[in-house]
Amino acid sequence: MSVINCEEVKRDEFHTEKYYDSYNIFGAHIVTEDEMRGVRFTVWAPHAKAMSVVGDFNEWDYEQHKMLQVTEEGIWSLFIPHIEEKEIYKYAIETTAGDVIFKADPYAVYAEVRPNTASVVFDIKGYEWNDKNWSRKKKKKSVYKEAMTVYELHFGSWKKKEDGTLYSYREMAEELIPYVVEHQFTHIEIMPLVEHPYDRSWGYQGTGYYAATSRFGTPHDLMYFVDECHKYGIGVILDWVPGHFCKDAHGLYLFDGTPTYEYKDKDVQENPVWGTVNFDLGKREVRNFLISNALFWMRYFHIDGFRVDAVANMLYWNKEGQEQSNEHAVSFLRELNEAVFAEDEDFLMTAEDSTAWPLVTAPTYEGGLGFNYKWNMGWMNDVLKYMECAPEYRKYIHEKMTFSLLYAYSENFILPLSHDEVVHGKKSLLNKMPGDYWDKFAQLRLLYGYFFTHPGKKLLFMGGEFGQFDEWKDLEDLDWNLHDFEMHRYMHDYFKELIALYKRSKPLWQLDHSPEGFQWIDANNNEQSIFSFIRQGDKQEDALVVVCNFTKATYENYKVGVPDFEYYNEVLNSDAEQYGGSGQVNKKRLKAIQEPFHNQAAHVEITIPPFGVSILRPVKTRKGSKKQDGSKTKVRSNVTSRGKR
């Protein structure tokens, strides 16, 4: 990291212009000045009357190391010789009211372990990365036409040691990575790792945006974890919260005694539901702080994506009784995405947005927000409401399972079965399923079958892969002892087979963002709650037929229209005995009957399993293997900064 002397920086560059390297100026940097080694401290506090650096080195006496104000807009700086790495410090700020408050450094790259709140001098340089092969491979692929399976996890509660203590970043590399590789997830998505004071905020209420939380080790330890993920072909996505922050006294809130990082207007400053305050996204210094932060994580931690939290809260002012768009936030998000994709055109920028805001994943030059993925919250809500309904009443809400296909290609979507749906009394995915013990497992297998065959990339929260019975308990680890029970082992085996089938089946991901990748066979059988559809790849023979039965009834010799192939194999049946099912499976090879049905050229007669999904693959084409018009399917993408698609 090249440290810039703030006295040489034109004030306009930080206060009025785009300045995305602000971490090179601000914070605590180990430097040599006038042949003396020490630390230069620089901070922005526009309304402070006076500033000091305090720590053990001066017995926390704010009279000793007074900072100099170097711009009228409130940049303060001081070089202190003979201070070394690991020194703890804070800023003592004299407010306009005459009070002295003590604040952690907004740009600190390391902090004390909670409950302590001081910043720590740390030289973030020096980690030797070994992920060039990962970077080369990533550039050769188009994420839009690849399989994507994301394992969402909370670092502190995935697994704990026997004595209840937390695994470190390095220890988690040894524990987590083999597990992720075994399950063939392509990415992990980690709930926020920025420094935060309260464990139960899960990291979403941060105080140190540049500091990887010290709960699990040093910044270099986290770099090692990411490096190891890349070594084994796993991408790393971080939850990132640029919309709001916590009100703890040592953090960003009222940083110099006045609203500094937050809006001044109380009507839009406060988030009463979360007890947080909103970043003032119309302020250039705040934008530079946040966009520099995004690039900092990309450059120094080599992460592969952000899941941007609470975008809906950013897009609209939270004034009671009003729904007015926040143009500051809209402009900020576009600027953020342009900066990110200029840095790395293969990066993942995912919006967690529950609104109907248009063009979230369209490039900014087309009027979009510039993300390249968006969580499909509508799909998640509809599907889970449908699954929680008693099977005999599902026919009355049939449209909840078909509505998503009306808008599935309006954005680049990720289908999230996330942490938000298995906490706060919402029950685990398994326990959402109605019926008896067997029914619950059968329906969860069915849900996963539908999940992996529906258009869109995939995200699953930890524990879902083996059927966690209890909802997520953030102060405990997962119920790993459930592997001692047969039905959970069956579920785990099924999930691994399903994700393996997904990854090796191009029709399930190659045209995720093109309408040509999906065709209903029968979307209207509400009486039996059976859905059938085709997933299609680039080539005609790359096709799968999917049949889902959302009741407990079994149907024999059930006619399903299919494309004109000669034979079909059943490549997966969720009711197979090896997955804990009743064994209502189909013989391996099914001959297609050359009589039209369901607007298809042929049909097969199959057994429809109870609460089951059957996936069929064509064995042999009757004529050719190319699309009739010889064209190549176009897939929607977002390359915000490149001026092309």
Swiss-Prot record:
EC class name? transferase
- Active-site positions on this chain: D309 (nucleophile), E352 (proton donor)
In the record, biological process GO terms are: glycogen biosynthetic process
Q: Could you confirm whether the keyword Endoplasmic reticulum appears in this record?
A: no
One GO location term (cellular component): cytosol
Spell out the family assignment given in the record's similarity comment. Belongs to the glycosyl hydrolase 13 family. GlgB subfamily.
What is this protein identified as? 1,4-alpha-glucan branching enzyme GlgB
- What organism does this protein naturally occur in? Bacillus cereus (strain AH187)
- Gene responsible for this protein: glgB
